[in-house]
Amino acid sequence: TPYSGSLPATISGFHSHDEMNIDLRPLALFAKARVIRAAADDIDLEAKIIHLAGRPPIHFDILSLNVGSRPDASKIAGADEFACPVKPIDQFLARWESVLPQAVQHVSNQENYSIIIVGGGPASVELALAMQYRIHTECKLALESKSSLNISIISSSKEILAHHGAQARQAALDTLQRRSIRVELGHRVKRFLSGSVLTESDGDYVSDATFYATGASLPDWPARCGIGISDDGFIDTLPTLQTASHEFVFAAGDAASIRGASRPKSGVYAVRAGKPLADNLIRFATGKALKPFKPQKHALALISLGDKTAIASHNSFSFKGRLAWAMKQRIDKNFVARFSKLPSMEAELDLEKGLIDAEAEAALRRHAMRCAGCGAKVGGGMLGEVLDDLHEGAESARKPIEDASIIPL
């Protein structure tokens, strides 16, 4: 799964795609969990069943939703056909890989090439500056030189980086202006068209490639499943990270809005919710009292400027330069490494007390494995024990059963 914090450096060409990705398979094995790559078609909260596309349904006792958000410009007419959102990141990178050679070819031939990015937040600023840096670098042009590349940021907001302090806003605006990136504020996009973007003020902006990184919104399916939605359009969540509508459903990250502690949709807040969420999931499973979580009010933001410099912004304080970039690089690389360079797996079974009964725990400990891999590695003794315990006759293929079974011939 891609780590969004490394996206600007990947666009600039400083990181490879592999360096920004976290492989969930070894991580899941390390955590003694399973990864299922399938889209959830529906969640039956009454029966506690998740229906998956192309797979048997999954029963659950506790559900945790960490589904993120999507740019709200996805609701604008023409978004699906003529514009590309920054999320999902894999989809964005596929589009960028097709745009990059086209832009380089046009600019190298001194032909106009226009890129429009809709949205006035950090993501739009980072994308615009990183794209320009990469294209100019590929064309062997100086960063601030005039070229036939035209990049524009269009936002309905009256300010760039509206949720940041005045110093950070001015630093970003100065950088964009110095690098000849056009900034159109107070213009709400009305429609995405083939080759242009139309605003409500009837401004028509020519575009060879259109991207959007607007404010966050929640997909429609949680509400359709019956999960309570807050006034701001996200999953209504209690301080314990339980949803207000269902005590056995938890939510965190961009998808959730914690009552009494609304925060900007930022990866910093999502990451900080990870440990409190894990703790409360275990507490709920073992019948213990849950602990409320109150996220910090302000967080450090590091906004990449595409050229190995960045803006550091915390509340009203801000500074710009290579030090901020070095801080961002260190944080991003350490985050990816933390979930990629894993210690050796322990054979000893480590379970929270009260999670299962003593008999089940004893059985699991007898078969604790260093690898939870392909199943062909299972020893003959263990396989024989399992087969002896199963009744004769194959289980129905419609049931979500994955144990071995004796099939009479």
Residue positions per predicted region:
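FAD-site-proximal beta/loop scaffold in flavoenzymes
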Residues: E81-E111, S196-L198, D204-R272, D279, ...
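A Rossmann-like FAD-binding core segment of flavoenzymes
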Residues: V35-D42, Y133-P239
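Rossmann-like NAD(P)H-binding beta-loop-alpha module
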Residues: W96-S147
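Beta1-alpha1 glycine-rich phosphate/pyrophosphate-binding loop at the start
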Residues: T1-R34, V125-H164
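N-terminal glycine-rich phosphate/pyrophosphate-binding loops that anchor nucleotide-derived ligands
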Residues: A360-L409
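C-terminal auxiliary extensions adjacent to catalytic cores
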Residues: D307-A362
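FAD-binding core/adjacent interface of flavoenzyme oxidoreductases
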Residues: A33-I116, F211
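A conserved FAD-binding loop/helix module that cradles the flavin
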Residues: A255-G306
